[in-house]
């Protein structure tokens, strides 16, 4: 009887432990995705809601204990997740943008990183009273910025000029640089404490070159292998996304095994090369990785913030805010203003970049990984999270205002993104241009693009449905006109316009089809507001321009009727 009772009790504890694990995992997923949804509804940086949710679930209520839940798996899971996030970020970069931003980007990634690291390390040493090793390590980690925070901010602000692509490139490329610097700084600081200054300097430079050399080489090889396999259709369509994910994990792991901490470099280079080749389409891969990254970022922030010790924040006292002020008011402005001297950037763009360096998931992950190698790890992680939370709050609440004050953003942009560059679309664009309204024509037809360029209209040879539209310089643009000859494309483009500018500013031509599409259109089930009225289909627009009708601009008044402008006027 006693034996039976012990057996039953043991089985019950196993069941309870299993249920606890399941509840915790479900809670992480629910809090992560739910926080993203709430942030999207409130139009605030999602990291703020994620941080609050993680703190409430972890140190406040004890609902989630990542160390008990995942044990030794915490750091490997964090590392692999960051690798996938950086791969996805690198796939949004376009090498063609380097023609305009190459020089300032190079200076930001070299001199700018060095200045940021030195100032932050000095602040950690003198303000936070860290020892030399921790100070140098924290300074290296804080050289990174948060692409997962910068991206949404840029989509909201839509700055004009070079600052948009420059901030995106810096945010993604500097992350593996910062991670590698942290590894080398940790080893170098330990060597310096052992009075091996010459060895520390030599090993640091040599290790940096080796890390980037091994990582870049393996990243290029992996991307080229994937390109060949996709081009020759060696991978079934339904397996392409999971296969690429497997390749990312394999490349990251293999690179780290070949040379310590070179994996992040490898996956970043892999994503960059894969995105900029022109032999196979990778749009579907990018969309899959974007969805996966959202899930990973959400879960990671919940896990990492749930591990925080809130008492460590209180222990800093005035030193925490003082260190944050140094990072925001001294380190970033100093690094940008000095590193961009003579790079051709206007002063307003340099000032804006000086106020845009939020830290995000990479800084949190790297700090959490290295904290286990240090004594007093909770204090080190708390210092990193002070900067993460502080920079997100400060930049998230003020960057939009500063961009408008500097003339880099418009509160109510009137520019128009036109999907298609056929003759009718060009006529509308020309009329808008004469009114000094910015226009941008997007088309995949080379003939239409050439004709638009010959007429002096800004053009982009791209698919309006491509995810890369999110990464364009949309400064001054505030609405979309979907004018293609395909009703379905117009509806989908209107959906993309709603993502960029909001549903209110997304327009499309009327539906010409009958049956289900007509019923959907009349019931409001289709995306986009109908431009000019339901009868204004592409066929009707094409007929009118074919008859010689032209586009004219007329000031509205109480005596003016819209029908007065609809005249069958032939051009002289």
List each model region and its residues.
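Transmembrane helical cores of multi-pass secondary ion antiporters/exchangers
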Residues: 2-412, 465
